[in-house]
Amino acid sequence: MTTTLERRESASFWEQFCAWITSTENRLYIGWFGCLMFPTLLSAISAYIIAFIAAPPVDIDGIREPVAGSLLYGNNIISGAVVPSSNAIGVHFYPIWEAASIDEWLYNGGTYQLVVLHFFIGVCAYIGREWELSYRLGMRPWICVAFSAPVAAAAAVFVIYPIGQGSFSDGMPLGISGTFNFMLVFQAEHNILMHPFHMLGVAGVFGGSLFSAMHGSLVTSSLIRETTENESANYGYKFGQEEETYNIVAAHGYFGRLIFQYASFNNSRALHFFLGAWPVVGIWFTAMGVATMAFNLNGFNFNQSVVDSQGRVINTWADILNRSNLGMEVMHERNAHNFPLDLAAGESLPVALVAPAVAA
């Protein structure tokens, strides 16, 4: 008997590397987009943690009045933040090598640009990695489309808005109270509450929460029991089973009687498309709204729109909102300018021509 031994060709190191990168058998899928995502996100996270703990104060307004944001400089978890880059830098690209020293780079808030730009590249690569894994597994590509909504929102507040306003100092601070400060100042300067795209975003977020709660409770309440009363219902199901887990007809009938017939879905694909599309489209609109307001195309102004027959103004909620906007703008950057832009831009009027007479 003759035995023939065929020499086995060994794959090159590059081929082995490619197979490992694109393998769906790995516990954590890497992918070619992951080669960009992992280093950028790790850089952003590392810089953020270090800056949140120990970064020195940043001259955010460019007027030599630094603002402290780190824990070691007196902040706590609520008040702490990575403070945005200085207004003196504007929208210039400000890597470490552009500064004369590390101290100057930290004083001008270079850490903020480092974190934000690496984070933005990382989450964009995460979208690509979602598409790549879906492609490898033969799935449809809608997961990455859904994730594009929060990425669009992040791009709007961290990249597009600072560019539109002319300075990264107008970007959203990376902290809890800094986020709230950004929201208040945004309302004061752009009247975002009166912008229709923001209204659609609110409907998307709150509506999505409502629909998610309704769907989850209906599914949990209409599970098809596969076990006896003496066993847990969870033992009757296994991951990837072909049989239905819950009775959509029963859920449809319940909800149709609870509200009205056409308020419920009897098609699972249409139902889940709606659950995915509603919040995603809403957040897309919010991101577009912030992007347009970045270039000062602001919310509607209905101030002093209602007057009586004598021409006297009848205040509406729009006027109340306008007064609160002016108040917030007065408090914002109080040392950088004396008046809000809305007040400082008007023609000055004399308030007194002569000194009042004082009775003896």
UniProtKB/Swiss-Prot annotation:
Homology family: Belongs to the reaction center PufL/M/PsbA/D family.
Protein biosynthesis recorded as keyword: no
UniProt KW Transport keyword: yes
Residues annotated for [CaMn4O5] cluster binding in this entry: D170, E189, H332, E333, D342, A344
GO MF, any single term: chlorophyll binding
Subunit field text: PSII is composed of 1 copy each of membrane proteins PsbA, PsbB, PsbC, PsbD, PsbE, PsbF, PsbH, PsbI, PsbJ, PsbK, PsbL, PsbM, PsbT, PsbX, PsbY, PsbZ, Psb30/Ycf12, at least 3 peripheral proteins of the oxygen-evolving complex and a large number of cofactors. It forms dimeric complexes.
GO biological-process terms attached to the record: photosynthetic electron transport in photosystem II; response to herbicide
Name of the molecule in the record: Photosystem II protein D1
Sites marked Cleavage: A344, A345
Function according to Swiss-Prot or TrEMBL: Photosystem II (PSII) is a light-driven water:plastoquinone oxidoreductase that uses light energy to abstract electrons from H(2)O, generating O(2) and a proton gradient subsequently used for ATP formation. It consists of a core antenna complex that captures photons, and an electron transfer chain that converts photonic excitation into a charge separation. The D1/D2 (PsbA/PsbD) reaction center heterodimer binds P680, the primary electron donor of PSII as well as several subsequent electron acceptors.
Note: 2 of the reaction center chlorophylls (ChlD1 and ChlD2) are entirely coordinated by water.
List of residues binding chlorophyll a PD1: H198
Residues holding Fe cation: H215, H272
Site features described as Tyrosine radical intermediate, chain residue numbers: Y161
Residues marked Stabilizes free radical intermediate (site): H190
Enzyme Commission code(s) on record: 1.10.3.9
Transmembrane spans: 29-46, 118-133, 142-156, 197-218, 274-288
Keyword list, A-Z: Calcium, Chlorophyll, Chloroplast, Chromophore, Electron transport, Herbicide resistance, Iron, Magnesium, Manganese, Membrane, Metal-binding, Oxidoreductase, Photosynthesis, Photosystem II, Plastid, Thylakoid, Transmembrane, Transmembrane helix, Transport
InterPro entries: D1/D2, Photo_II_D1/D2_sf, Photo_RC_L/M, Photo_RC_L/M_CS, PSII_D1
Organism of this sequence: Emiliania huxleyi (Coccolithophore)
Gene: psbA
